[in-house]
UniProtKB/Swiss-Prot annotation:
Belongs to the UPF0122 family. This is UPF0122 protein Aflv_1766. The lineage of its organism: Bacteria, Bacillati, Bacillota, Bacilli, Bacillales. Might take part in the signal recognition particle (SRP) pathway. This is inferred from the conservation of its genetic proximity to ftsY/ffh. May be a regulatory protein. InterPro entries: RNA_pol_sigma_r3/r4-like, UPF0122, UPF0122_fam_protein, WH-like_DNA-bd_sf. It comes from the Bacteria. PANTHER family: UPF0122 PROTEIN CBO2450/CLC_2298, UPF0122 PROTEIN YLXM. It comes from Anoxybacillus flavithermus (strain DSM 21510 / WK1). NCBIfam families: PRK00118.1-4, PRK00118.1-6, YlxM.
Length: 110
């Protein structure tokens, strides 16, 4: 469950601008603020089932966006490459502060 939550949080971060305001609100409350379906339903004065359906549809949309655009997959690949690069620099060029500084700046862009 934690793995799914983490994945949804990343997908939400990447694709939230493609969602409707209601979808953004429900996903934010459910995944980021850890609200229950019942709490969201109460806040928006809708049924728990309506919230559940909206979240499930939105999850499917986020997965579909990722399947087409691959932003999260590419992010993970860049993260792994940066880690390998940092390790290589630390082992081969431990005194090159400028090189390490450049890698750290690349990491900040992520």
């Amino acid at each position: 469950m934690l793995e799914k939550t983490t994945r949804m949080n990343y997908l939400y971060d990447f694709y939230q601008s493609l969602l409707t305001p209601k979808q953004r609100n429900y996903m934010s409350l459910y995944y980021l603020d850890d609200y229950s379906l019942g709490e969201i339903a109460e806040e928006y004065e809708v049924s728990r089932q309506a919230v559940y359906d909206n979240i499930k549809r939105t999850e499917a949309m986020l997965e579909d966006y990722e399947q087409k655009l691959l932003l999260f997959q590419k992010f993970q690949q860049r993260h792994k490459l940066l880690h390998r690069l940092k390790t290589h620099i630390a082992e081969r060029y431990p005194n090159d502060e400028e090189l390490m500084k450049l890698v750290l700046e690349l990491e900040k862009l992520e």
